[in-house]
Amino acid sequence: MDNQVQSTDNEVWEKVLKARSFVPGWTFEEKSRYMFDIVLQSKPSVVVEVGVWRGLSVASFCAASLIHQCKVFAIDPWSKCAMSENGYSVHLTEGQDQLDLIYHQFIRDFKVLGLDKNLTTIRKTSFDASFDFADESIDIFHLDGAHTEWDSTRDLIAWTPKIKVGGLFIMDDANWETMKLVQELALKKYEHSTYLEGGKTRVFVRKQ
């Protein structure tokens, strides 16, 4: 039985590797594997990612959900206007027409990869989407949204009540200068768990 389970895990992991072969992004394989494994280990009911772009990181959650059935929510406005609100658009080279194409390509790619079975895509800003979730309803939360001090701290305040005590908060680009403040604030409600990607990603556990 254990060999059969391992075989299934490996077969599904191949979907992530396939996604990594053609979906652009900056997620290291170490992080992809961590996010795949953490779903299988912690057996969540609800997983949320904010900041999807082309979907490279959320592919791990979607693949793992085929083994351990859980709901995966991918949240991104794919909006030039939304990204311009607090100056983050300086990091964005695409116009709105290109962002629309990226959104539709993401939907198509995940259908072709067979990764959309448990996936719900929400095309809203992070703040607006936070109102769609009940308090303490999220087991794993991955934040890869706008990395300004304002946006990241607003995300922390908006989403922390939605994450279960004992739930995971995975923060991307923790090595950015503008992400220092949100990490200091996070430690008031979370405990540090681990770093990934040489400090690029930081994982917290909600303690209160």
Please give the residue ranges for each predicted region.
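A short alpha-helical cap/connector motif
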Residues: M1-Q208
